[in-house]
């Protein structure tokens, strides 16, 4: 397996629509203001978070059960800023739509700027032939409220190419989160 370079990522985004919309450089400022960077990097792609968030709340006592997820434990917020309560959690989604090739898997890592503020971002791997907007999990590990900026970089995807295509892809297995649009809640 090899990690893929900016040249390969750009070629795949432009010829195969692997990432859409695609930004072919690192963007670090907007209107002369510093932002959390996004776009193509040397060996990855920094994706942006959209303005749709689902924030966990305790207004209705509930137990988080991945097999019977109760949406009442969430509040939906459409905003350029998401405030995550202390020691809490929020879901977001990428602006970019991903369409993975059959011989490639992508691993997501968080932005160091967020990590240094106690904000951890988790995403499971984008498996071969996975397609859709990617739901991002933001965890505020601090005892203080934390701010997430919509439209700015949230995480980086690293693309690993196998030496041959897989036998069974995410699409072949009818992956439950395929072709997701927006924040997608857990389902079993």
Swiss-Prot record:
Homotrimer. It is an enzyme of class 3 (hydrolase). NCBIfam families: dCTP_deam. It comes from the Bacteria. DCTP binds at residues 111-116, 135-137, 156, 170, 179-180. Belongs to the dCTP deaminase family. Catalyzes the deamination of dCTP to dUTP. Gene3D superfamilies: 2.70.40.10. This is dCTP deaminase. Keywords: Hydrolase, Nucleotide metabolism, Nucleotide-binding. Its EC number is 3.5.4.13. InterPro entries: dCTP_deaminase, dUTPase-like_sf, dUTPase_trimeric. The active site is at 137 (proton donor/acceptor). GO terms for biological process: dUMP biosynthetic process; dUTP biosynthetic process. It catalyses: dCTP + H2O + H(+) = dUTP + NH4(+).
């Amino acid at each position: 397996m090899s990690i893929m370079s900016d040249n390969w990522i750009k070629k795949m985004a432009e010829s195969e629509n692997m990432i859409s919309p695609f930004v072919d450089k690192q963007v670090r400022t907007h209107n002369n203001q510093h932002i959390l960077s996004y776009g193509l990097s040397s060996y990855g792609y920094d994706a942006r978070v959209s303005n749709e968030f689902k924030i966990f709340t305790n207004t209705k006592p509930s137990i988080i059960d991945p097999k019977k997820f109760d949406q009442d434990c969430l509040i939906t917020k459409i905003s350029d800023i998401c405030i995550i309560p202390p020691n809490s959690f929020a879901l977001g989604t990428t602006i970019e739509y991903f369409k993975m090739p059959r011989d490639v898997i992508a691993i997501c890592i968080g932005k160091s700027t967020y990590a240094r503020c106690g904000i951890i971002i988790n995403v499971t791997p984008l498996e071969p032939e996975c397609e859709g907007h990617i739901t991002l999990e933001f965890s505020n590990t601090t005892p203080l409220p934390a701010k997430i900026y919509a439209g700015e970089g949230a995480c980086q995807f690293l693309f690993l190419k196998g030496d041959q295509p897989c036998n069974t892809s995410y699409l072949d297995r009818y992956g439950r989160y395929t072709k997701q649009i927006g924040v997608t809640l857990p389902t079993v």
